[in-house]
Amino acid sequence: MNTKKTFKSALEFVHKFRRKNKIKREISDIEKKIRDNQKRILLLDNLNQYITPDMNYEEIKKIIFMMKNDYEDRIDDYIVKNAELSKEKRSLSKELKLIVD
């Protein structure tokens, strides 16, 4: 009987632990969606500040093009930074493995 209770407790623990991890992932996903939408709002606000009633179509397109280039440059910078951090993480993992072994 005690083994049955222990097994049931273990299953309940695993179930709750998995649920907790799923909730953490969902919260992280929702936070990312909130950040993305806040960035979109900021982008539209910025665009609204640059566009004036006297501008023609070509001037507006130029502003959008420049903003797009700026964001693409930022993405490139983030990709490089991410690669550098990944390399450092791999190096630390190797060093930690050597310490443990």
UniProtKB/Swiss-Prot annotation:
It comes from the Bacteria. It is found in: Cytoplasm. The keyword Nucleotidyltransferase does not apply. Its main location: cytoplasm. InterPro entries: DUF496 (IPR007458). Residues 68-95 form a coiled coil. Keywords: Coiled coil, Cytoplasm. One of its GO terms (cellular component) is cytosol. Pole-localizer protein involved in the regulation of several cellular processes. Belongs to the pole-localizer TmaR family. This is Pole-localizer protein TmaR. It comes from Buchnera aphidicola subsp. Schizaphis graminum (strain Sg). The gene is tmaR.
